[in-house]
Regions:
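Residues lining hydrophobic/aromatic ligand-binding pockets adjacent to catalytic sites
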Residues: 1-169
Length: 169
């Protein structure tokens, strides 16, 4: 999980990109299934994240409209990273007006000798972002590949149509 996208989000702060990291226990365990990753609250990351979101986005056009749906993720103590991520995904899908992806209820272990031929790391971004007005646009150029919250706080109900204008990289 260490250095994984499963527990990170990028937002735009007044001095540039800020990476928010959800702290987890035993981050260095290799090949730990995400369903078994437990959250670590010893570092007060929830307080830091919520403070960063408020400081960065309170002047965004839609922050006040959506903030109440995000705040519970920074008040409640979730046990597992997977539950936290799924809960947040449900809220994001709901706010964006898109259906929640259907997820499997069971995990099928790969058979011994099965080859995973998918590339391990893709080169460059899969999509080229459609620029939109960001909270600090008057001070810095457009910053792509941020959290969906950045787009949602800036564009509100138009967020999905902005995503639809992205093109293949």
């Amino acid at each position: 999980v260490k250095r994984s996208e499963r527990n990170r989000a990028r937002i735009l702060a007044s001095d540039g990109v800020m990476e928010l990291t959800v702290h987890v226990r035993n981050a260095n365990r290799p090949r730990q299934p995400v369903r078994d990753v437990r959250l670590d609250y010893s570092k007060r990351w929830q307080h830091q994240h919520w403070g960063a979101l408020v400081a960065s986005y309170r002047s965004s056009p839609y922050f006040d409209f959506y903030a109440g749906r995000f705040e519970p993720f920074y008040r409640r103590e979730w046990e597992f990273l997977a539950d936290y991520n799924l809960g947040l995904l449900e809220v994001l899908c709901s706010l964006a007006g898109v259906p929640m992806p259907e997820l499997s209820r069971t995990y099928v272990e790969a058979a011994p000798g099965d080859l995973d031929l998918r590339p391990k790391r893709k080169e460059g971004p899969a999509l080229i972002a459609e620029p939109y007005f960001q909270v600090f646009s008057e001070r810095m150029p457009f910053v792509p590949n941020l959290s969906f919250a950045d787009l949602l706080f800036a564009e509100g109900p138009a967020s999905v149509s902005v995503l639809g204008r992205c093109r293949q990289g």
